Amino acid sequence: MNINAPPKRIGIMGGTFDPLHYGHLVAAEMARHEFALEKVIFIPTGNPPHKVGRRVTSPGDRYEMVKRAVQDNSFFEVSDLEIQRKGYSYTVDTLKELHELYPQHELYFITGADAFREIFTWREVQSVLSLSHFIGASRPGFDPLEFLEELKRDYPEFLPNMHLFDVPALAISSTDIRSRVKEGKPIRYLLPESVRLYIEKTGLYRI
């Protein structure tokens, strides 16, 4: 065993995934390649505190859709870690559990540019920043300068853990997909066919 070998890296992609679409998958695959991640674990949120008061599809259905979406990529996995947790799901708790499961690995949390900018509002933000690297999937029009200046001012020690990278611009959103289903419009080619068939079979988003 080479004791000087760098630690292996695991990508973490958390989200409501209501539903998961090609935008999520492209960002995960690009990050896996760009940051030499051993694998990417998709973790659907259980009871997300930021969605209080909003209608969210059941954890079981969201988990099943993610499972179907990632089954053809040997570098992708899905975890029910947050779904099984009672109460609200906080990123800090998830990262602590993952560190126990993968003590020899570095964690890389993959998120969109908008969520990347909101990290300072997360519960126990200092612990969150110390537990994982963060990868922000940038998009056209996103200006990271304000975020980076805030990071330099308040948490300069964590600046090396924050990474931005460009991903192909895909104008796809879960909100739009739900609206299209409700309006009877096609969603083919916006998300994996296995997910589309699951939505059709279960009648999700029709009302």
Curated annotation (Swiss-Prot):
GO BP annotation list: NAD biosynthetic process
Keyword Disulfide bond applies: no
Transmembrane stretches, start-end: none
Keywords: ATP-binding, NAD, Nucleotide-binding, Nucleotidyltransferase, Pyridine nucleotide biosynthesis, Transferase
Pathway where this protein functions: Cofactor biosynthesis; NAD(+) biosynthesis; deamido-NAD(+) from nicotinate D-ribonucleotide: step 1/1
Name of a matching Pfam family: CTP_transf_like
CDD domains xrefs: NMNAT
Entry GO MF terms: ATP binding; nicotinate-nucleotide adenylyltransferase activity
EC code: 2.7.7.18
Catalytic activity: nicotinate beta-D-ribonucleotide + ATP + H(+) = deamido-NAD(+) + diphosphate
Family designation: Belongs to the NadD family.
Alphabetized NCBIfam families for the sequence: cyt_tran_rel, nicotinate (nicotinamide) nucleotide adenylyltransferase, PRK00071.1-3
General function of this protein: Catalyzes the reversible adenylation of nicotinate mononucleotide (NaMN) to nicotinic acid adenine dinucleotide (NaAD).
Protein name: Probable nicotinate-nucleotide adenylyltransferase
Species of origin: Desulfitobacterium hafniense (strain Y51)
